[in-house]
Structure formats: structure tokens, C-alpha cells
């Protein structure tokens, strides 16, 4: 339709030019005739009388009419005859005048002048010109208000220059679109500096694409991959001179670039003055313009992305984000941001506003700061992304997302939602209250208590924007749904998908499971889907055959392949850990039951040649040991599931003990770390449970047991309960009110329930020891230790109620003893001390049920 309009406009223009030239020739002929060729009849009025619309009384002798003589004007009849329609038999080819031929000649000269530029690589305008936008409405919709000069531009993660060989993909549909680009006078002339935007874009600090409408690309598989017709505006050509300079310091493409000051200022003006109404529906392609700054793109809560209308301007101005090399604070205060639509998560910088204490605002950290914050405060607690920062930023994240094919558009989609999940992870992993006093660090530094607390005014604003847990869960669910939407595409292009993209895609699932574990939520559905996705990639085969796999050779390609397989196995290891954590929390059977206790060192401290810095899980050796402690704690959870009583056949006859005490296969980490403290607390709880379950086999359980046997049993139980209480208190003190470990929420609740169930044991043991006739010095020491144990339990009660982000666990009013009714074989008590021992046995069965059927 645009092509037909352009053709008709050109034809009318040619006809008007031809008519004007014909009239000029007629006037020249009339002037040349002079006074010798005057009109001979008064069939028409003169020009002056026709203009004044009066009667023309022409007199032959005076050669003038009465009106002209009266006004002393020249009586002339020089009107050009009106052009009439074509005569019969008229054809367009025969009727083409000199004007049309001259127009074609002018066009030929213009094409000839551009012949030299066709042989060189062509730099097309930014992709956001491909979508016709009129006042925030799609092309064809009536405009309700004057449109902005052009839709605001988003910075692409990667730019690939367009060369002539890409024109081989043109089809008949594309040819029609290219012919409908509008008249030549309305097309924009781009400066030469815009041709280098591809090289400028490669060095950008942004590692993540910003396709707010990327999801619908994969909802319309039949859509054409060719760009729609160009819609350009000549009034905005000067603002597209140069993209921002590189900002990420780790990339191998981060080379210093020198740009003109005027182009840089125009780029800033472009990002900060976009106040027109622009609506980007979700069914738009990521190849279209990224209309917002790259630091803020999380579109998680809504199906469309809408910026404020032209009339909704705010007083605050959007500040430009500065580079990390500059001393100024790169964080933009919320007070300097424009309004944000309610109900949206992670709207762009120009569309943000404070939404109360329940809003989730993504994009407060740039891409570089986001990765830095993850490796500084999250990665040391558990390697969700199982690779060091240098390899991630310099290799894995360097993915081509230019929409030249469906595979590249898929890369763009995956990388975008990976960034969204990573920033939501920092929302979950950061505490925004009571952190300045807990940390002795400077208020201008980023620390574990406030990842975004760079300035005092920002912290003050941040207190009003603490996201509610329900909104965090809604954002996680939406991110998870977007991953499921793309999964069929990934399966279809699995052979042609880069291992980098596969690593990013699988890491996003691990991030979501990590966040749900941090929040203490039931993630059965998410975990089951994640296991299904991992199994479709056949990663379990790599893990099962790890010990018999071939060693990588000297070839770099072979080492690269084994390196990415190592990353896949690390990710599957983490998935098995979260599966075991889910099973321990809710008592559900494990979805994947592969043993991993023996794989801690081979996977995370591999032998050569995979022990190089490139494939190391952490490049800093000092931080590697705490990280391995968290990994060993995850392996302990899997072993707790494997050694369950209900996992095997339970005895139907009386037995001395349901489970023989034995040490764990996992090597215990150091005691001075938070994972190590949790590890030893769980081991102490298991030892106490085994000791209580073994009471029926002890000689003191007999009705006529001697006092010495009773005191000996009390000493064994006292040592077990004191050690368990001491480990739990040490764990909670080390973890603090905000445990950074993903297992902290679940393990703290498990230990809290265990303390509640066993809190009467010290008092009963003290009474039993005092009631016996035999008193020794060790008895007095045991009483002192049990008294200290009672004091520790009081402190534990207070510490467990200060845990965040999970709510403090409520004590269970009644824990049923179903297992004791099924498998207990002890008879009724026959003596007073047996009454106490039966109470201990009842506590043991309750503890066993808590371990076997779920901590929550």
C-alpha cells in the first residue's frame, strides 16, 4: 500500500511539473506576439475583470475594457487554458511528456552518483526504525496526539554489520517491502559515523539484550525473519551518530574508543528525552529497536511494556549512568527516575517510579555491577553459575544476539531472561534492613548487608521499595514461564545451539531453584520441570560415566568440549542438591537419585588439564575453600536422603536399632565456615537420634537395671544433647540474622524443630542423675554441662525468630508418632526410670518422623 501511494504521488508531481512548463511556454508565446496579437472577440472577460468578478465591457478602438481604463490597469488576456483530460485512444506510454522523462533522468543521475557506495558494506539504520510507530500505536492506527520524533532507542548487546551477502536472503515479500520505503525527500541521510555502530556496540558494557518484547517471537513460528519496510524520519538523523562507549572492563572487546563529544551528548539526549508515548507489545521481535537503556530491561510481570505518555512528564531528570572507571557513584537514585507503571517488574529506566513497599524494581545495577555483585556476595556461598567471573564475562556471555536467524533470536531471548533471573536473585540475596550496624564496612561500599547501598540517599529511598515476598515469587514464576516458552525452540535447535547458550539456559533454572530454596518455598513443580529439562539434554549420562570418561587430549577443541561437559555436570550436581533439599524439607521422594558424595573433588577441583584457571569454579584460591564447604553440605543432604529409614525395608520384628550409627561418606568441611557449622549440626542431630533410638538395646532399659547403668546411659545422652545444642547455637551465631547459604532457611527450621522436640531432655537427665544414689565428680560436671545446654536452648529460640528471609518457624502443637505405632516394639514402662526412658524414645520417634517425612 505504501508502494502504491509513493508511485501515485510521483505521477501527480510529474504531471504538475509538465503543466507548469507548458503554461510557461504559452505565456512566452503571448508576450512575444506583443500588441500585434490582440484578441478579436469578447467571448471572455479580461484577467482583471475575472479577478474582480465584474462585467468586462471591451472596446476595440481603445484596446481596453472600461474597468481597466477606470483603474488605469493593463487590460490583458493571458490566462493559461485549463488542462483537459486525455483524448480517446490515449495510452500512458504515448502520453508521457517531457516532464516525466526529465524526472527519470534526474533519478538516473542520482543513482549514478550512489553507484560507488553499493560495493561497500552497508550500515542500515537502527533496528527500531523497522517498526512503524505513531504515537505509541502500531502502524495503521490513527494517531491521537503528535508523535515523538522517533521511538526511543535501546542498545543491543551485540551488533553485526550488514554486508551485501546478506541480501541473498531477500525474497519477493522483502522486495515489496523495500520498494515501499517512501519518497526520497522523506528518507533520512545518515552520517558516516553511524556506519561504525556495529564496532562500537561490540565493546559495550551491556552483556544482556534488552528485548522487552522478545517472548512473542517464539509464539509465532511462522513469522518471516526478513525486516519489515523502513520507516525513517529526517528530523532525527542527527541523534543517531554514535552509541555509548564501552563500559565493561572484563570483556576482551573492551577497547578504548574515541568518539566525538557532540555525538556522545546527542546519545545522552536520546536516552533522557524520550517522553513520548511508546507502546511495545510483547509480540514484537527482539530485532526491533531496544527502546531503553541496557541497564534496565526486566519485563517480568506484564504482557506488554508501556512507557509514560507525553503528558505524564516528571520533574526529575534521568541521570546518565557513568562508567566504573569514574569515581562517581554509578547507581541512579530512585528519586531521579521517571514514573514507573504499577504492576510491572523491571520497567526501563525512563518508566520507573516508586511503587510502595511491595514493588520489585529491577535494573538498579548495570550489567557489570550485576555480575560483580553476584560473584562478590552470592557465588562465595554457593556456585550457582559454576564458573569463575573471568571466563563468564570474557567467553560465555559473548553470545551473538543479532537477529539474523532464529537461533540468534533465541540466544537473545535466553540471555535476556538470564539477566532478569540474576537480578531477582540479588533482590532475594540482599537484606535492606538492619545491615549497617551488622556490618563494620564503610557506608559507601557494597557489602552483604546491602548490595545496592552505595549512597545514603539511595538507602533511604530503598527502604520504601523493599519487594514483598509474594511479588518476588510472582516475578520468579513469570521468569520460569518464559523459560518454558522457549524450551521447544531450544529442543528443535539443540544441535546448532552453542554450548555457551546451553550453559546460560541451564544456569537460569538453577538460579530459580536457588531463589526458591532461599525463600523456603515449596518448589516441587519448578524442580520437577528442571529435572525434566536437564534429562532431555542427557546430562545424567555424563555424570554417571564421569569416572570412566575419556581424558581430554592435547587438542584445544577437545579440551573445550570437556570443559563445557564439566560445566554441565556441575549444573546437574546442583540440581541434585536442590532435589535432596526439597526431599528433606517436604518428605517427598527424590526425583533424581544419583549418588554425588564422591564427586565433590572430581567436579569442582578437577585434575589436569581442566584444573586451569579457565575452568576453575573460583579463580581466587582463598575463596575456593568456603565455596567447597557449601558444595560438601549439599552432598550431605543427598546422603541424608539416601540413608533414610523409610528408604529401605523396615524390620517387623524387635531390633536393637533401626539404623546402625556410621559416619558420613562426605568429607566434613572446616568448622569455621557457615556451611561447616550446618554440617556439624546435622551430624550432631543424627548422632543424638541414633543414640535415642538405641535406648531399648541398652542395659539400663531393663526394669531391674542397676543405677550405674542408668547413670552411664544418662552420660551418653547428656553428651549427645550438649554437643547438638552447642553446634546449633554456633551455627546460628555464625549464620547471623540473614544467612547467605541457600540451605539456611530449611536447615534452620529443621534445627529449630529438633530443639523444640528435645528441649525437655536436659531437665529430665538432671533429675535422673540427682535421683540416683551414686554420685561421682563426673556427675557434677554433667549437671553443669546440662545446665549450660538449657541456657543455649533459650538463646537458640531467640535466634531462630530473627532469621530472614523465611518466616520464623512456629512450634508444632503436636507431632504424631505414626512411625512408633508401626515399628515400635517397646512395652509399657515398669519402673520410674523407664517412664523417663520411654519419653526419650517417644522424642526419638518424633525426631525420626521429622527427618523422614519433612522438616516443614
UniProtKB/Swiss-Prot annotation:
Compositional bias annotation for Low complexity: 1-13, 184-207, 261-270, 277-294
GO MF term list: DNA binding; DNA-binding transcription factor activity, RNA polymerase II-specific; zinc ion binding
Skewed-composition ranges (Basic and acidic residues): 18-37, 99-117
UniProt KW keywords: Activator, Cytoplasm, DNA-binding, Metal-binding, Nucleus, Repressor, Transcription, Transcription regulation, Zinc
Protein name per its UniProtKB record: Glucose transport transcription regulator RGT1
Pfam family, one: Zn_clus
Main location: nucleus
UniProt similarity note: Belongs to the EDS1/RGT1 family.
Span list, region Disordered: 1-42, 83-121, 168-244, 261-330
Lineage: Eukaryota, Fungi, Dikarya, Ascomycota, Saccharomycotina
InterPro entries assigned to the protein according to its UniProt record, in alphabetical order: Carb_Metab_Trans_Reg, Zn2-C6_fun-type_DNA-bd_sf, Zn2Cys6_DnaBD
Record's function text: Glucose-responsive transcription factor that regulates expression of several glucose transporter (HXT) genes in response to glucose. In the absence of glucose, it functions as a transcriptional repressor, whereas high concentrations of glucose cause it to function as a transcriptional activator. In cells growing on low levels of glucose, has a neutral role, neither repressing nor activating transcription.
Locations listed in the record: Nucleus; Cytoplasm
